[in-house]
Curated annotation (Swiss-Prot):
Superkingdom, taxonomy of origin: Bacteria
Keyword flag GTP-binding: no
A single Gene Ontology CC term: cytosol
Protein name: Argininosuccinate lyase
Enzyme Commission no: 4.3.2.1
Pfam families: ASL_C2, Lyase_1
Upper lineage: Bacteria, Pseudomonadati, Pseudomonadota, Betaproteobacteria, Burkholderiales
Amino acid sequence: MTSQLHKKGEAWSARFSEPMSELVKRYTSSVFFDKRLALVDIEGSLAHASMLAAQKIIAADDLAAIQRGMAQIKGEIERGEFEWQLDLEDVHLNIEARLTALIGDAGKRLHTGRSRNDQVATDIRLWLRGEIDRIGGLLTELRTALLDMAEKNASTIMPGFTHLQVAQPVTFGHHLLAYVEMFSRDAERMIDCRKRVNRLPLGAAALAGTSYPIDRHAVAKTLGFDGICANSLDAVSDRDFAIEFTAASALVMTHVSRFSEELVLWMSPRVGFIDLADRFCTGSSIMPQKKNPDVPELARGKTGRVNGHLIALLTLMKGQPLAYNKDNQEDKEPLFDTVDTVADTLRIFAEMVAGISVKPQAMRDAALQGFSTATDLADYLVKRGLPFRDAHEAVALAVRVCADRGCDLADLTLEEMRKELPNVAHLIGEDVFSYLTLEGSVASRNHPGGTAPEQVLAAVKAARAALK
């Protein structure tokens, strides 16, 4: 079956001797996902029309009609009244057809000096620029929530882990600040990516530019671009800016996923460091006692989704010769879904972090296990003249003794410690036990980047200042 609308003629139909089949029409149409670009498409078209009038390529009356018609179309779209037509293929031709129906020949003059190739590239950049700014704001909200929680827990002691084994005591505030650093780098990547997004392709036309006396810099200024794409072939054909954004988004989600993994572990009754607010959890259809951390679990899963979009976009571009190819129609759905996934995740996590209930005693009890102050004992011996490797070996022997006895280093008396460490007994004094307390351990890491409560509060203050 073929389309009867072809009798009216598509924007390009005069070249062909038979109409497009309905199957091909459905296969090649993008309007039901690229209509998301409608408002930026109108914005770009208005800037283009203003330039055409300023350059006397179209008449002032045509510009006025275009502006009037676009205002009506924008209202129809915002009210949900616009009738999108599959037969008109994409967002651009749908809007142009409606404009022409409203204002006549002036609508047909709008496309002078441009192609859908540079038009869609402009639309995507305009849209993505706004979404980058939105995501930047959401990253700020998440970091603010983490900083609030870190400040409240600057002195809350928990075990630090390597290989998921207890390593050394840290503060919960210090642990959260690690994620503040990760998300801060993510924000920097978004800002840097925005610089390359914010270049105007319009004026490149199909691929070679246009013979009309256009003013690309004027359009760039009107639309808030930092400049123009310098090469017309590159302007219409590459989507590296979208790939770069998706790569930055994949890193955002990777950091979210790492945090999610810890939230799931911490909430487990076997660990019990935190509890998440009920509104971020679900129950079980069969087990009435269950409270499942579905939000962080789902965030881990959605990370794979964004990673997949990155691979999809890289694969999309890898085999394309210059200039524009229809392949690029497939750039939008991965890009749109990446934005939606990242934005929704960041918004939810900012709210979820603010609602975390911390269980300090459970954290402290866990930090007392696993000989977390063993390194402090080694440092104690080093400060009394013993080479570090010798101190390391001596403390390792003491740990083995305590493990056999089922006690901690701090549980040994001074006499027992000297007895078990005869080679260094002369270096061990009564003050050794102050080094084996959790508070003493974290307080001793009192340098920039360290876990001492004083440093945690200083880091929170610095991070807040950086957000302003």
